[in-house]
Amino acid sequence: MRLILDTHVFLWWIVDSPQLSSRVRDVMRNPANELFLSVASAWEIAIKVNLGRLRLPDRPDRFIPGQLMKNVIEPLPVEMGHALYVSRLPAIHRDPFDRIIIAQSILEKMPVVTRDTDIAKYKIKTVW
């Protein structure tokens, strides 16, 4: 199964956070599953680091690609269609990064690994 990781799931995974559910750990460890991180998540992380709201052990432009490689996670580009599809989404979730991830989930037919209950309100499959 191809899965999109929500930003918090990626950050929790790389530090082995106890906040990850056992189901998520099992799904992410399963070699039959392909894990993806949206470029929107990388952008969100970079912005939060720049604003001082998130600390990383290295600059985002070095840290994130290194973690993707180490954890066998593929980047999921944001395409024009993803960005434009956001205009069709109901206004349940206001976070622009999450709205892109939701659009990617719909258009790419990929579940989202997330604890965010607002994302789960959309007509997409989520894993938690």
Locate each region found by the language model.
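Short, well-structured N-terminal submotif of metal-dependent ribonuclease cores
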Residues: M1-S38, L51-G66, E108, T117, ...
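Generic structural signal for small/hydrophobic residues in well-ordered secondary structure
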Residues: T7-H8, I45, V86, S105
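Alpha-helix capping/helix-boundary segments
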Residues: V9, S41-A42, H82, I101, ...
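Signature tryptophan residues that serve as conserved aromatic anchors
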Residues: W12-W13, W43, W128
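Short, conserved active-site loops that position catalytic residues or coordinate cofactors/metal ions
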Residues: V39-I47
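Active-site neighborhoods of divalent-metal-dependent phosphate/nucleic-acid chemistry enzymes
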Residues: R53-P65, M69-R115
